[in-house]
Amino acid sequence: MASTIDIAAIREAQRRQGPATILAIGTATPSNCVYQADYPDYYFRITKSEHMVDLKEKFKRMCDKSMIRKRYMHLTEEYLKENPSLCEYMAPSLDARQDVVVVEVPKLGKEAATKAIKEWGQPKSKITHLIFCTTSGVDMPGADYQLTKLLGLRPSVKRFMMYQQGCFAGGTVLRLAKDLAENNKGARVLVVCSEITAVTFRGPNDTHLDSLVGQALFGDGAAAVIVGADPDLTTERPLFEMISAAQTILPDSEGAIDGHLREVGLTFHLLKDVPGLISKNIEKALTQAFSPLGITDWNSIFWIAHPGGPAILDQVELKLGLKEEKMRATRHVLSEYGNMSSACVLFIIDEMRKKSAEDGAATTGEGLDWGVLFGFGPGLTVETVVLHSLPTTMAIAT
């Protein structure tokens, strides 16, 4: 029988010493680009709803206030004309939606993952774990299995499939990747979030304006990151360290954001006070996350917040007294891609590190050392990840 000392030594050898680190990032979108200024006319025309004049005006105002310039969508006008059930508000259409997402979600994820692996520069055989996250459909074997096949990963790669989590899940996947990387020596975790709105697209209804809000905000996109602890600086270039990660359900928030998979697809329900609920509770989450570091000035850290919509960002800024530039990367991604659910925060990390390098900032976090990543979504669930940036000049050692 092994002694306690032997077991302790084995356990110590299995774990890493340093924090989990983001080593590479890749993103991808469908080729079909939709400009927000044109979208109300297109949306009401393709759904044969132009007779709903007042509702169209409301939708135009939603789009105008969305702070979105463009989005990417797999669903083209041609496909929607061939599948008119997707354009109705409550027509049975799940089969047609599933036919799209079970194929296209892994494919879009592959595009993002391929870019991340290329930037990482290591053989894909070194990937030990795969986390795949999507709110777009469900299937068995899952999108994680399909991506393993598409990428040619080892059949022994340890897979985790997360379906139907929602917009907070960009934080969830990083929290899980952190635990995997830090507790498995030599682990290199491929994280992929891939979202396609084919499961939520539907025509307008004047009694359910919350559904219309989703039509004004959501876009398609996939993002991938490679996560590992104790990077090999001769071959890997670390971007951000993950110092802590937490999840909480906000008080008195049940029913604030719901999604239900039905014969008609994934229906979306939203209460008006979501921005208020988030802004009311965000400082408590920040204080709990940053008190071990002695940080209380929220303008002294960099910000990566899920852009659920402009009202959420506005109220968070107001509540915390944030300077306008704090949400620059977040608002840029919202403007150029819309709300891509779980993939958004990974797009924002990518935007921040690229802009930091372009601007000659000292670190990947806009020149600052510490930052926060927030994910918000159904529950209301909030994910809080504390990030430590690294020098933008950090090159692979030779």
From Swiss-Prot:
GO terms for biological process: flavonoid biosynthetic process; polyketide biosynthetic process. Gene3D superfamilies: 3.40.47.10. The active site is at C167. It is an enzyme of class 2 (transferase). The keyword Acyltransferase applies. Pathway: Secondary metabolite biosynthesis; flavonoid biosynthesis. Its EC number is 2.3.1.74. The keyword RNA-binding does not apply. It catalyses: (E)-4-coumaroyl-CoA + 3 malonyl-CoA + 3 H(+) = 2',4,4',6'-tetrahydroxychalcone + 3 CO2 + 4 CoA. Keywords: Acyltransferase, Flavonoid biosynthesis, Transferase. One of its GO terms (molecular function) is naringenin-chalcone synthase activity. Belongs to the thiolase-like superfamily. Chalcone/stilbene synthases family. The primary product of this enzyme is 4,2',4',6'-tetrahydroxychalcone (also termed naringenin-chalcone or chalcone) which can under specific conditions spontaneously isomerize into naringenin. This is Chalcone synthase. It comes from Callistephus chinensis (China aster). The gene is CHS.
